[in-house]
Swiss-Prot record:
The gene is eIF3j. One of its GO terms (biological process) is regulation of translational initiation. It comes from the Eukaryota. Residues 27-45 have a biased composition (Acidic residues). Keywords: Cytoplasm, Initiation factor, Protein biosynthesis. GO terms for cellular component: eukaryotic 43S preinitiation complex; eukaryotic 48S preinitiation complex; eukaryotic translation initiation factor 3 complex. Component of the eukaryotic translation initiation factor 3 (eIF-3) complex, which is involved in protein synthesis of a specialized repertoire of mRNAs and, together with other initiation factors, stimulates binding of mRNA and methionyl-tRNAi to the 40S ribosome. The eIF-3 complex specifically targets and initiates translation of a subset of mRNAs involved in cell proliferation. This is Eukaryotic translation initiation factor 3 subunit J. Component of the eukaryotic translation initiation factor 3 (eIF-3) complex. The eIF-3 complex interacts with pix. InterPro entries: eIF3-like_dom_sf, eIF3j. PANTHER family: EUKARYOTIC TRANSLATION INITIATION FACTOR 3 SUBUNIT J. GO terms for molecular function: translation initiation factor activity. Belongs to the eIF-3 subunit J family. Residues 1-66 are annotated as: Disordered. It comes from Drosophila persimilis.
Amino acid sequence: MADDWESAADSEIILQNAASTVNKWEGEDDDDDVKESWEDEEEKKDEENEKPTITDVPVKTKPSKALKAKLEEQARLEEEKEAKRLASLTPEEKLAEKLRLQKIQEDSDLNHALDTFGVTRAETNGNGLDSFNPETKEQFKEFGSALSWKVGQYRESAEFPQFVEDLVRGLCIHLSAADIKKVKMSVEILHSEKLKMEKAIAKKAAGKNKGKATLRTESDDIDDYKKYGNDFSEDYDDFM
């Protein structure tokens, strides 16, 4: 009986050792599984962090076809209205309109030039032009607009034409013959346009005066006779 107990105890002990060994290995496997799952989660987090964040972009709503068609129709009507207005203008009125638009463009160029160089209109009345330091072609163009505006303020003076002539001559001294020729051609084109404008204005004024009726009196007829040597006073003296 004792032998049976001893053998049973030995076998039980062996079983417990085997079980503990198996459990130990199983525990080690569980640790490995936990480690691998933890590494997988870390990799997933890294991948999620590496993904670029997508920000919501506001979607621009396109105008409806009906609204777009209405706007295009309004623009077309405005263009037709402006075309009719220009067509009804006389030649001198068209030229005046051209000069008006040119003046608006010059003012716009001047404002742009002043903004570019950080100069105000008030400064151009003093020494503000010294603030300009043009280097590029566009900057020289803007500087020229500002300078023309400044000089043009004295156009009503009787000395202005001679001043411009002297100014152009003084500036052209620094140019080559080829460049002076370009300036000459530009001035000739301007002269031709001005001549057409002045003729159109004079023609319009003559047309208005031509339609006026004149009243002749008896004294006017007598004056005409006197021009040809017929003096009624002499005839009257002879008669007496």
